[in-house]
């Protein structure tokens, strides 16, 4: 079952929906430090927000780390006020051939309507911008000035999005 990306504004005041999207490089340095920072942030969101929608892709190490950290925090803290949502740029063969497994791992799977209509080379950036536009908070793990995650961070900055770059956070 493919669910198209909803065209909704940031959050949803009627049910106090707080939307967070995540973007990072395919490979990340200091994975344990980043995981600790993610866990602290996710824990705080689960405890302080009425309902949290965690939007992620499936494009590399950072996405996998976010997904596993969200799932772990939901089990340990509470799982009744959040959804882990995989947002695909288009219906991939991997998804279509393993749909049941995807739906068992993620609370929701969406295909971004805007990016599904684009050429595959621009679909990821279109999906990323759509995710930024619907988010209350955009979390990055970007430590170099190139790549799709960096381009998305530049877009989020220009859009005046509320952003955190976990690579910049100091203790």
Give the predicted meaning of each segment.
Residues 1-14:
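Short, Lys/Arg-enriched N-terminal segments with co-localized hydrophobic residues
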Residues 11, 15-170:
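Acidic/glycine-enriched connector segments
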């Amino acid at each position: 079952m493919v669910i198209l990306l909803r065209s909704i504004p940031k959050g949803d005041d009627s049910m106090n929906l707080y939307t967070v999207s995540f973007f990072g490089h395919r490979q990340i340095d200091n994975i344990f430090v980043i995981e600790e920072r993610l866990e602290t942030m996710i824990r705080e969101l689960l405890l302080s927000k009425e309902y949290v929608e965690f939007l992620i892709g499936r494009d590399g190490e950072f996405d996998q780390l976010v997904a596993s950290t969200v799932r772990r925090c939901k089990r340990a803290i509470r799982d009744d006020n959040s959804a882990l949502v995989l947002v695909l740029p288009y219906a991939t063969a991997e998804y279509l051939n393993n749909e049941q497994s995807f739906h068992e791992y993620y609370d929701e799977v969406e295909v971004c309507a805007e990016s599904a209509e684009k050429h595959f080379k621009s679909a990821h950036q279109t999906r990323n911008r759509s995710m930024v536009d619907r988010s209350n908070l955009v979390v990055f793990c970007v430590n170099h000035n190139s790549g799709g995650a960096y381009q998305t961070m530049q877009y989020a900055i220009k859009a005046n999005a509320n952003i955190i770059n976990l690579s910049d956070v100091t203790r």
